[in-house]
């Protein structure tokens, strides 16, 4: 099994619900290590740049508006098959379709306010981790 890194963002809705610790416990329970973390309030420019891949999609403006609506908790996770494990923990994008016991089923309200973001592939994970944690801010342990 490969040790991977992935990016996770706990979105403004979940931060406002004060469930960061509960979500971290799920990461750790699945064998994922938090190797970098910070709480930030994204600027519109940061959110637009980070989600730039979706720029032409009809939901782009609403996504950016939501991501700048309050603080987010950003973390790099590391572990065996970290990308897939994190995506399984998150559940389906639409919390109404997410399996019971997933982060989105338990903490998200809608497809827009869906509690968490997670990298979808190794290539995007590398880009996303570097976006928020450039250089020496990531510590394997």
Swiss-Prot record:
So what EC number does this one have? 2.7.4.6
Transferase listed as a keyword = yes
Where do the catalytic residues lie? 117 (pros-phosphohistidine intermediate)
Single GO biological process annotation from the record: UTP biosynthetic process
Q: Which UniProt keywords apply?
A: ATP-binding, Cytoplasm, Kinase, Magnesium, Metal-binding, Nucleotide metabolism, Nucleotide-binding, Phosphoprotein, Transferase
Pfam families listed in its UniProt record:
NDK (PF00334)
The places in or outside the cell where this protein is found are: Cytoplasm
Kindly list the GO molecular function terms attached to this UniProt entry.
ATP binding; metal ion binding; nucleoside diphosphate kinase activity
Q: Which InterPro entries match?
A: NDK-like_dom, NDK-like_dom_sf, Nucleoside_diP_kinase
Tell me which residues bind ATP.
Answer: 11, 59, 87, 93, 104, 114
Kindly list the GO CC terms recorded for this protein: cytoplasm
Domain of life, source organism: Bacteria
| Catalysed reactions, as listed in the record | a 2'-deoxyribonucleoside 5'-diphosphate + ATP = a 2'-deoxyribonucleoside 5'-triphosphate + ADP; a ribonucleoside 5'-diphosphate + ATP = a ribonucleoside 5'-triphosphate + ADP
Q: What class of enzyme is it?
A: transferase
Co-factor requirement: Mg(2+)
Which family does the record claim for this protein? Answer: Belongs to the NDK family.
- State whether it acts alone or in a complex, and with which partners, per the record: Homotetramer.
Q: Which HAMAP family match?
A: NDP_kinase (MF_00451)
In Swiss-Prot or TrEMBL terms, this protein is called Nucleoside diphosphate kinase
Organism lineage string: Bacteria, Pseudomonadati, Pseudomonadota, Betaproteobacteria, Burkholderiales
